[in-house]
């Protein structure tokens, strides 16, 4: 082979190999860029948390006269409610956590986090009950369907999207620019341990059967000169607690069958809260311990604190409780069923 031909062959082979060599480099560069962005985000969040460390920590507010609360529109009220017929433009998909999520912006420039899947209805109803007794919540609204402009092919939740960007069964959470997330908080390490306010929130998790009590479902927001502690994800509610085979969410038939109070022992009450997997199937021991710890949220709660919460809930009318579920797009039969169970549980608290 002549030197000239050998040179041409080598050059051709090099041209074929170079694109393949560049793929890992581009992938590595992309991963490094994402890692850098995440590190910067965490650094900024840490700086905000340190700057807000001297702000008062609060977990409840005075809800006012219960009779005046509009539980159909909830914490955001009618004035902040999104328009189901409005214009919404896709911003980005969120691949964190379990449920399909993406962000949109409306015609007024308001940003919303859209959640799809099994949780939107349950979360919309649960946040209204929490807000009714004074706990902080996100402004959540439910759409049976709405249209999103520029919606790409989603990585998750494509089964909830129809032709022309029509999205079905969505929860929209308002994302006001004035609210800054400082971080997460643990049920067992926070400024309110031992208070009736935190104990009441523990009871609320059991009342709605919210079994996913991980710390990353709890948020600390900086707003209005306060550090507000809230449960920011209550989507795993209104079903059955239990191991990975038994638990459910947003399932009336399961919610109706579950027991509320497990045991009354003197001055303390244990509520039913099952989360750990069956021991013989627990391949991940760390997860088993994590889930077992979650179950403690519903245990050894002072009877007086549980009764205090029950007295607050008892001030809500049947119509208001029904509005929680009506706002979440449930059928009339489902509204009847969920309302009946909630009222039964409120009566159990009042009878302690």
Say what each PLM segment does.
Residues 1-5:
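N-terminal secretory signal peptides that target proteins for export/translocation
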Residues 75-187:
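Conserved ATP-binding subdomain of kinase catalytic cores across diverse folds
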Residues 96, 118-122, 192-199, 210-211, ...:
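Extracytoplasmic/periplasmic, Sec-exported soluble proteins
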Residues 106-108, 133-134, 205-211, 346-350:
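Sec/Tat-exported extracytoplasmic proteins
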Residues 122-123, 128, 180-258:
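Conserved kinase catalytic-core segment
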Residues 140-141, 218, 335:
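Residue-level detector of family-conserved "landmark" positions at structurally sensitive sites
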Residues 228-352:
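C-terminal catalytic region of ATP-dependent kinase domains
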